[in-house]
């Protein structure tokens, strides 16, 4: 049976890639299962994807493997694209402030770069290109 993808997942910079290198095979397998759910389910359960209350537009992908808990920070871009920023292994109930600050910084940087690229494209193609 062919899966139908509703969303795509993209990585911004290398922070998520570096985090991923630290994960065990079992955690990676679980992570890819959660990614598949996120890409194919119309409504994603909060068990797997939840907004970060303190930062507008930022979300956390939630992964549990055994007693280990992991969070991958991300955002939506135009509704159907999920941009991955950085990840952590949670060791306490509270998400570390420095990890949230980093994710917020990366999200702002992503949208600033995107806007710059769109402005450059608009300049190159002229005002009537869209």
Region locations from a protein language model:
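Basic, Lys/Arg-enriched alpha-helical interface segments
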Residues: 1-69, 78-82, 90-130
């Amino acid at each position: 049976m062919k899966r139908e993808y509703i969303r795509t997942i993209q990585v911004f910079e290398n922070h998520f890639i570096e985090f991923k290198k630290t994960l065990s095979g079992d955690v990676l397998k679980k992570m890819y299962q959660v990614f598949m759910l996120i890409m194919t389910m119309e409504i994603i359960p909060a068990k797997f994807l939840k907004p970060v209350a303190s930062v507008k537009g930022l979300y956390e992908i939630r992964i549990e493997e055994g007693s280990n808990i992991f969070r991958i920070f991300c955002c939506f871009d135009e509704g159907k694209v999920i941009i991955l920023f950085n990840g952590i292994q949670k060791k306490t109930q509270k998400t570390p402030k420095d990890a949230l600050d980093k994710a917020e910084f990366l999200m702002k940087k992503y949208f600033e770069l995107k806007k710059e690229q769109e402005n450059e494209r608009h300049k190159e193609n002229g005002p009537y290109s869209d």
